[in-house]
């Protein structure tokens, strides 16, 4: 069984200290008094322990931001999701928020416009995040597009689209898969999708003014031809008004951003996304952007990039020193 993770704003500071000094902090019970959620794929009947951060000094790394460039494309006015390509070095995939045509855009890390890829067979009600992950063909990386926005909490179901990662110069990609998702607790607002690059497991993080962020999971081996109810994992308490606006998962690190901070977890070898989110995150101060929602990890986890909504916004690079 997996306990809900509740990290009050002040408590996170002590968790970061514990992580850097080798201490271990245990997650608290669900703040809403709910039952203990079940970890996906776990047959254990005992709570999963919170583990210490594995890399010495991880929380003490100086994550210094620098402007890598500016977004050139005049079509990118409401960037909400980002993903760094593993196959095409230096390519960043971006997409717009609600009200835009279904399309993804390729830039390089300096913001140079490399092309627009239209996706005419997919719907785009409120795309909020994107991720790179595995799919049916093990030799191919896939772009996951999270149509999970629901400001009014009125959507009975949301969608996650998946396409093979295209070449940046291709203008149209037809087809694609769509996974229809429901939540066990009813409609939620969400802007964060994490996809495990190892097995395609997915975690959706909700968004709330309280900062209490519900987490839901979907197994990577689901049949995408039928709807699925996500599994409730628990919650993160990021602090009042700390809204989860985007995230990314790699083989060594996981990040979830708010408008002001980035919460970063280091992954132990073989750990699942759910297990990783039980460990202590580090808090990294983000540059206050116009409306910062997108974040993307580099393939090796050594750096991440953020970018905001708005025309010709800067691309910020955070590299560990």
How should these model regions be labeled?
Residues 1-9:
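Bacterial N-terminal signal peptides that target proteins for export
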Residues 11-14:
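Sec-dependent, cleavable N-terminal signal peptides
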Residues 17-19:
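C-terminal motif of bacterial Sec signal peptides marking the signal peptidase cleavage site
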Residues 21-23, 40-41, 47-321:
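Sequence/structural signature of beta-propeller domains
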Residues 22-31:
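Bacterial Sec signal peptide processing site at the extreme N-terminus
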Residues 31-45:
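Extracytoplasmic/periplasmic regions of membrane proteins
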